[in-house]
């Protein structure tokens, strides 16, 4: 079974605030690495502690925070932003 991704309204607003090139880079990353993959965990890192249900992905200088929804094979994009401002 392959995975797909959905972008939350919050993440969509954050994408719109970025310059067009950065937003395109992030969406291209999601299309190339996440959409159609059999295991999105291979591309990211799981956060620790209370946030261990969140995965982070890095696309250039940007981080993408996601929640894996295994029962429907969807990666829900929660937040995007420059990595200096995102959770480690």
Give a label for each model feature:
Residues 32-56:
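A short, surface-exposed loop/turn module that caps and links secondary-structure elements
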